[in-house]
A protein has these predicted regions:
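Intrinsic, short, N-terminal disordered tails of RNA polymerase sigma-factor systems
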Residues: 1-44, 52-56, 121-176, 182-195, ...
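Sigma70-family region 2
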Residues: 43-44, 67-71, 82-100, 119-121
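Residues in the helix-turn-helix
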Residues: 75, 197, 204, 208
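Structural recognition of an alpha-helix C-terminal capping motif at a helix-to-coil junction
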Residues: 78-85, 99-111
Length: 221
């Protein structure tokens, strides 16, 4: 059992975009340490190393979880907490010879989402503009700017809803490939599926999204 497994889990810092005070970035904390070195320190119970590792991955991992949660921020934050609890407790189990730290963390986060969705018999809801994580401009903004922002928000919501209608195995590969920009080799590490299968799923998912979105497909980013 790793040392970290018997130590109390350190409190996660506030999400960087929610914190009242500026939060030191990974670049100002242990800037020269690679992910693998940080994880080794985490395995020995180093809470500072854990904070740096968390800061490096919180945004992209949260973004992935938010999309898998259908835009439900509170749920994605809950999954993020659980995922990094597992990172802390399982730091000593990572085998550098079998893969890098990044896909290992994504795998933990994805498995967290999968298990939580299965446990709660999760069903994707209708995605509102707010749930899609879209900030509307201030009422005092110009009329054209507001209209343009709303148009963009509606397109993003249409994409989010189309994404949630995909089967889980298609949605996962789309989110990991397009939103998080992982290679198919990394996605294979995360999901456990062969690269050829993942590429097939990806192309089928893209075709399904284009069909579902119709004219919006060319506008959506």
């Amino acid at each position: 059992m790793s040392t970290a497994a018997i130590l109390p889990f350190p409190p996660l810092p506030a999400l960087a975009w929610d914190a009242d005070e500026p939060v030191p970035s990974a670049g100002t904390l242990m800037p020269t340490l690679a992910d693998g070195v940080l994880l080794e320190r985490v395995a020995r119970g180093d809470a500072d190393a854990f904070t740096v590792l968390y800061r490096r991955f919180e945004r992209p991992v949260f973004g992935m979880l938010l999309r898998l949660a259908g835009g439900r921020r509170a749920l994605a934050e809950e999954w993020l907490q659980e995922a990094f609890t597992r990172v802390w407790l399982g730091a000593g189990t990572h085998d550098p010879s079998r893969g890098e730290v990044r896909p290992w963390i994504y795998k933990i986060a994805l498995n967290t989402a999968r298990s939580e969705m299965a446990r709660k018999r999760f069903r994707m809801p209708h995605v509102s503009l707010d749930e899609a994580g879209l900030d509307l401009p201030d009422e005092r903004a110009g009329e054209k700017r507001v209209a343009a922002h709303l148009d963009e928000a509606r397109r993003a919501t249409a994409v989010a809803e189309a994404l949630q209608r995909l089967p889980d195995f298609m949605r996962e590969v789309i989110v990991l490939r397009c939103s998080r920009e992982l290679s198919f080799a990394e996605i294979a590490e995360v999901t456990g599926a062969p690269q050829g299968t993942l590429k097939s799923r990806f192309h089928r998912a893209v075709a399904s999204l284009r069909e579902a979105l119709g004219p919006e497909a060319g506008k959506a980013r």
